[in-house]
From Swiss-Prot:
Protein name: Valine--tRNA ligase
Domain notes: ValRS has two distinct active sites: one for aminoacylation and one for editing. The misactivated threonine is translocated from the active site to the editing site. The C-terminal coiled-coil domain is crucial for aminoacylation activity.
Catalytic activity entry: tRNA(Val) + L-valine + ATP = L-valyl-tRNA(Val) + AMP + diphosphate
Family: Belongs to the class-I aminoacyl-tRNA synthetase family. ValS type 1 subfamily.
E.C. designation(s): 6.1.1.9
């Protein structure tokens, strides 16, 4: 007997809290490396310790949880490794803002005190996202939660750094990097946000040395950097400037002679075809400078203020210097013209300051040898990227990879384990802090002040979290991990680096599969941002609609390679689905009162056609769901379960079974109750990975002995031969098609569902005739018929509306059911409204100014609306024609 009744209305908040606490207390999330079961492991992409749950996190972790719960139910020992990232610059900025509010700064505190302050902040305020992930239902092994700066991971970071240094794969060099003049640190490419901005293109005259009156005109978007020019360049095949190559020009304002070089980098179509080369302030120019052995002249300091190399502009902030340089060029008659010019400008992802290409002494990883193995591992299939289209992006990045700048000029992070000797100048790199120089023995050593790029520790995440460099049971059982679920934006910055580090230090790929999910956008397809005001807060959604509805929405729209357009109306729609499951379960439980499924022998049951059909469809749903999840087609799996639950189980089977449940003899009633119980119990287990809370709540109330203490650890349903009834299923499909046909006639003719009608079924074959005779009770009941005639070559009444289902003609006599005159008026009125809409959409789409200027998705939407109203009109015209035939 059921342990308790379900409440009339589902209240998600209380249910979610209750079951999550139970799951944690019972240890269902914990992974045992010694269990002997086949293993399945996922490492969570560690969210920033400063972060709060956003839609990207919600999608990413919902998909991971679906996989983990599904595999757990399939008998796997599942490890879902959780943790957070120390998020160097982001965390340092949070604490610096706190200090500023207190009237102090990190520099006033000093490094050690500041680091202590950050740890204090982390203990008190950091990691709120972990609690938010729990609200999402994430079944992580929270006892193993890691932090990229905890003791174990810090040890792994130092081990990796030292080994790479000793292998010659880490080095220090003076090169160009992304530099934030406000944060005073190098930035990785992913930490630079590019935005198109309106700017200018200044055309400047550079006098040719030795040829009075001759100039070359150089076009630039950054005239202030000309102070650091060490050449101008032309294309080697540009005949306009062939005679200039090898000559010199005079750099305006500072009057320094610089050479004219020929280089294929120059775009002959851009500007005048002559470009200034500033190797210390432009990445492309840096490469040109290396090819031509040009000087590197840095004219800015760390705050982007002009230094002494900038002569009379020394001490000026870069944009103030730009204004003065342009004014001075104009005064000298060397400014030829200024054009409007839009171009991409890079900004610091934290403080939005315009980033400066900056010449600086930094630490690098020589990634070429590491990238070769990582590239081969995807090409030979050891790691599979899904969707496959992202493999080409991965190949392109890895084949054109550049050495990785790993040093950052901040305080919060893994401090680089390098010490410089003030006595002999040598560098000591060590796993344990040295007290003396390894080269000369002097104690005059000082540690590098830079810390490592946050991505360096993140690159070790799959194995460092499992105890490496020690040989642990976790590594033996769970590495390589089974799957990584992540967004495309960090495919190179994180995924590729994990591949490189995993292969180098573990000699195995870090994961077998990489599933790349799309972005969650707003309903119009725009990226969500605070400035646009279109952000949907996952926690607000969970509070309003419940976690299960939210999770199912994300899964239902998670099609491979297609961004999710999310609107609250869609989540509300899936809340209705949650309520449908709840109400269907309440109906089932009322009819299962006193039922004991454990006493039933399924082999002795006399199954009805409806029973065979729903069992066959259950088999199909189980097989289709498993196939879709194996292929990471989350939307297909969700779609299968939605259709089976709502349409086949709730709308059809429950209605078909009511006759047996209410009016059948004891044997028929017992069979119907058993099938109802069996299908609902299996359905809940099928849905559980997607909707964990409501499924557990209902499952615990079902009658009979449970095979497991929680649905979480019950088996996942599979297709089984004893439920395979293809012939019975095909039979019921025709019955349902006939019922749908009769219902369609009701709808078209505006006959109330409550009003009983008659129907005539003229069958094209003896097989259809016998089939419908066997299932007459279903047709009568679900089509709400007062009379039903089934035969072959039956006469069609003149006043009948007609539908066709297979080889069966359905005729519904309409005499006395429809007021022909009133129905004709109603249809004409509706058609008139649609004509106005069609005219409005037509005018808009015939307007060239709208079609050419409006965004493509807006135009496409208008075309869809036109097609939709046109189709509606066609349906009404067909109904009008039928009505007029009755007159």
């Amino acid at each position: 007997m059921a342990e308790k009744e379900l409440a009339k209305v589902y209240e998600p908040t209380a249910v979610e809290r209750k079951w999550y606490e139970t799951w944690e207390q019972e240890g269902y999330f914990r992974a045992n490396p010694d269990s002997g079961k086949p293993s399945y492991s996922i490492v969570i992409p560690p969210p920033n310790v400063t972060g709060a749950l956003h839609m990207g996190h919600a999608l990413n972790n919902t998909l991971q949880d679906i996989l983990c719960r599904w595999k757990r139910m399939n008998g796997y020992e599942v490890l879902w490794m959780p943790g957070t990232d120390h998020a160097g610059i982001a965390t340092q900025n949070v604490v610096e803002r706190q200090l500023a509010g207190e009237g102090t700064s990190r520099h006033e505190l000093g490094r050690e005190a500041f680091i202590e302050r950050v740890w204090k902040w982390k203990a008190e305020s950091g990691g709120q996202i972990i609690g938010q992930l729990k609200r999402l239902g994430a079944s992580c092994d929270w006892g193993r939660e890691r932090f990229t700066m905890d003791e174990g991971l810090s040890r792994a970071v130092r081990e990796v750094f030292v080994r790479l240094y000793e292998e010659g794969l880490i080095y220090r060099d003076n090169r160009l990097i992304n530099w934030c003049p406000r944060c005073h640190t190098a930035l990785s490419d992913i930490e630079v946000e590019h935005e198109d901005k309106a700017g200018n293109l200044w055309h400047i005259r550079y006098p040719v040395v030795g040829e009075p009156g001759r100039f070359v005109v150089v076009a630039t978007t950054r005239p202030e950097t000309m102070l650091g020019d060490t050449a101008v360049a032309v294309h080697p095949e540009d005949e306009r400037y062939a005679d200039l190559v090898g000559k010199k020009v005079l750099l305006p304002l500072v009057n320094r002679e610089i050479p004219v070089v020929a280089d294929g980098y120059v775009d002959r179509e851009f500007g005048t075809g002559v470009v200034k080369i500033t190797p210390a302030h432009d990445f492309n120019d840096f490469e040109v400078g290396r090819r031509h052995n040009l000087d590197l002249l840095n004219v800015f300091d760390e705050s982007a203020v002009v230094n002494s190399a900038g002569h009379q502009y020394e001490g000026m902030e870069r944009f103030a210097a730009r204004k003065r340089v342009v004014e001075d060029l104009e005064a000298l008659g060397l400014l030829e013209k200024i054009d409007d010019h839009a171009h991409a400008v890079g900004g610091c992802y934290r403080c939005k300051t315009v980033v400066e290409p900056y010449l600086s002494l930094q630490w690098y990883v020589k990634v070429g040898p590491l990238a070769e193995r990582a590239l081969a591992a995807v090409k030979d299939g050891r790691t599979r990227i899904v969707p496959q289209q992202w493999e080409n992006t991965y190949y392109d990045w890895m084949e054109n990879i550049k050495d990785w700048c790993i040093s950052r000029q901040i305080w919060w992070g893994h401090r680089i384990p390098a010490w410089y000797c003030d006595h002999c100048g040598e560098t000591t790199v060590a796993k344990i802090d040295p007290t003396v120089c390894a080269a000369c023995g002097s104690d005059e050593i000082r540690q590098e002040t830079d810390v490592l790029d946050t991505w360096f520790s993140s690159a070790l995440w799959p194995f460092s979290t499992m105890g490496w460099p020690d040989r642990t049971p976790e590594l033996a059982a769970f590495y390589p991990t089974s799957c990584l679920v992540t967004g495309f934006d960090i495919l190179f910055f994180w995924v590729a680096r994990m591949m490189m580090m995993g292969l180098h230090f573990m000699n195995e790929v870090p994961f077998s599969d990489v599933y790349i999910h799309a972005l969650v956008r707003d309903a119009q397809g725009q990226k969500m941002s605070k400035s646009k005001g279109n952000v949907i807060d996952p926690l607000v959604v969970i509070d309003q609609y419940g976690t299960d509805a939210f999770r199912f929405t994300l899964a239902a729209f998670a099609a491979q390679g297609r961004d999710i357009k999310l609107a609250e109306e869609r989540i509300a729609g899936y809340r209705n689905f949650v309520n449908k499951i709840w109400n269907a379960s309440r109906f089932a439980l009322m009819n299962l009162e006193g039922f004991e499924p454990d006493t039933v022998d399924p082999a002795t049951l006399d199954l009805s056609n409806a029973d065979r059909w729903i069992l066959h469809r259950l088999n199909s749903a189980a097989a289709e769901t498993a196939e879709a999840l194996e292929a990471y087609r989350f939307n297909d799996a969700a779609g299968t379960l939605y259709r089976f639950t709502w349409s086949e189980f709730c709308d059809w089977y429950i209605e078909l079974a009511k006759d047996d449940l209410y009016r059948g003899d004891d044997a028929r009633k017992e069979t119907a109750r058993y099938v109802l119980w069996l299908v609902l119990e299996n359905l809940l287990r099928l849905l559980h990975p997607f909707m964990p809370f409501i499924t557990e709540e209902i499952w615990q109330t079902l009658p009979g002995a449970r095979p497991a203490p929680s649905i979480m650890v019950a088996g996942y349903p599979r297709s089984v031969p004893e439920r395979d009834f293809p012939d019975g299923a095909a039979e019921m499909e025709l019955v349902m098609e006939v019922i749908r046909g009769i219902r369609n006639i009701r709808g078209e003719m505006d006959v109330a569902p409550s009003r009983e009608i008659a129907a005539i079924l003229s069958c094209g074959s003896a097989e259809s005739l016998h089939l419908l005779k066997r299932n007459e009770v279903y047709v009568m009941s679900l089509a709400r018929l007062s009379d039903l005639a089934i035969g072959q070559q039956l006469e069609r009444p003149a006043d009948a509306a007609i539908q066709v289902a297979g080889d069966v003609e359905i005729a519904v006599p309409l005499k006395g059911l429809v007021n022909v005159e009133e129905e004709e008026k109603r249809l004409l009125k509706e058609i008139g409204k649609l004509d106005k809409e069609i005219e409005m959409f037509g005018r808009k789409l015939e307007n060239p100014s709208f079609v050419e200027r409006a965004p493509a998705d807006v135009v496409a939407k208008e075309r869809e609306k036109l097609a939709e109203v046109t189709q509606k009109k066609d349906v009404l015209l067909a109904s009008l024609e039928k009505i007029r035939k009755l007159a």
